[in-house]
Amino acid sequence: MQIQENISLKTYNTFGIDAKARWFAEFANVEQLNELLSLSIQHLSSNIQHFILGGGSNILFTSDINSLVLKNEVFGIEKIREDEDHVYIKTGAGENWHRFVLHCIENNWAGVENLSLIPGNVGASPMQNIGAYGVELKSVFQELEAFHLQEKTNYVFGLKDCEFDYRQSVFKERYTNQFVIMNVTFRLNKKPVFNTSYGAVEQELEKMGVKELSIAAISQAVINIRSSKLPDPAVIGNAGSFFKNPIVPRGIFEDLQKNHPGIIGFDNNEGNIKLAAAWLIEQCGWKGYRKGDAGCHANQALVLVNYGNASGAEIFELSEQILQSVKAKFGVVLEREVNIVSREA
């Protein structure tokens, strides 16, 4: 275990941005993390900043990072208990999310099949309350263990402690860079409750010729849909959906409908309407746009891409232009789903 200097992060982020970390190290457990923190203070700087890196699938580096980047390599999937209806699976934060989902399906543990093929690691899943096709992480979340970087103490966070919301949790803003998520425990169902409420999933299942519904079939349907709409980061650098779908009061949505009859919105069951950000962006003419190696994907306007050698700053500037144009045309303020990481991370 050692601390390296001036390491390229190009292969550690799905955008493929060639930012450099001033210092870089990996840890596989709390003991190694503690040792690295002590070493960094003793030998590098007493006020050194630390940045925790997971799968690198939801970040955009806009510059080199003048911090110690600590790569989370905590692995392991363990069934810790079960009852008549549920199994409780404790999973290392460094585990790949999609591989974890496939492991659950192989064991007939239900609840995460709709979240298939979401990029990133398990540790990031509660940070942003990942969700897709009618399911959010919070519906299968039991608890997580996290290590406080300053106090050097372990904490357990339950469902209420995490304050989950749409693509949001306490770790994304309030506790940014204060805690390291070490593992997450999921409560999965022994008796599946299928969720095919999204039309695209039902259509894909029909296209697949599925006669008997199963979690494996739903997972494959989701994989097919995502593969057809979203570019593979191994081929074209991207972080999936760059923007959140904005939520507006019903009255605002009705006003928007008068001026923009084709606007797409979905009831979020809380009296508000979730707008389709991709539609807003497409109406502003950004779908398929490219300047240099930074662009907006031709098949999915929510996805910003690096066609090769774009800098993080160039992609960020493109996102700024998109935000401004959507606000000017619709009066709607988009939020980035991707975390922006600058020099002093």
Regions found by a protein language model. Name each.
Residues 109, 312-318:
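Beta-rich strand-turn-strand
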Residues 32, 96, 273, 318-319:
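Residue-level preference for nonpolar/small residues embedded in alpha-helices
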